[in-house]
């Protein structure tokens, strides 16, 4: 019973975390200050405006056991540049926990497009689909799905200066529980 209470405390923080960014070792190592850098495959999640600045296809993947409590995070992403001004990216992220009593799964699928109309400016947008499921003793206590949108900007006014802005969940991410 004590373990069950601990699991509920942990999962309540995860459930209401509102799409925390656990993506990429480098962005996390930078304390999340990756919005203006946005120069690898993790830019799909952090700032989609970085996509057209990538000059080759990129694939990224990670797996982590968070908090040493069998809460796992899996991530896979791929970016395809089309010329010098446009790139698209897809990624999938899963945070989950599964034991004999309690299970939780949070899946997110992103589709991102980035466009660089000028050398100084690039913009990007992400459409995301979210699916969540929580159960206890084999019984589902909440399934939800929803969609959301993100928008990103990168401005490079100088060779050694880049400014980034990411707007997450524009208009609110609508997640409906069934």
Predicted segments, located by residue:
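Sec-dependent N-terminal signal peptides
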Residues: 3-15
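Subset of outer-membrane beta-barrel
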Residues: 18-178
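Positively charged n-region of N-terminal signal peptides that target proteins for export
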Residues: 1-4, 119
């Amino acid at each position: 019973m004590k373990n069950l209470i601990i699991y509920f405390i942990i999962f309540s923080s995860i459930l209401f975390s509102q799409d925390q960014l656990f993506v990429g070792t480098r962005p996390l190592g930078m304390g999340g200050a990756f919005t203006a850098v946005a120069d690898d495959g993790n830019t799909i999640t952090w700032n989609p405006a970085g996509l057209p600045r990538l000059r080759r296809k990129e694939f990224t993947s990670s797996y982590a056991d968070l908090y040493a409590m069998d809460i796992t995070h899996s991530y896979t992403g791929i970016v395809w540049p089309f010329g010098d001004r446009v790139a698209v990216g897809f990624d999938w992220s899963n945070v989950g926990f599964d034991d004999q009593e309690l299970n939780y799964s949070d899946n997110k699928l992103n589709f991102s497009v980035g466009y660089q109309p000028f050398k100084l400016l690039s913009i990007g947008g992400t459409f995301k689909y979210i699916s969540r499921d929580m159960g206890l003793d084999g019984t589902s206590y909440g399934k939800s799905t929803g969609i959301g949108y993100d928008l990103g900007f990168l401005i490079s006014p100088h060779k050694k200066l880049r400014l980034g802005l990411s707007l997450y969940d524009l208009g609110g991410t609508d997640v409906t529980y069934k």
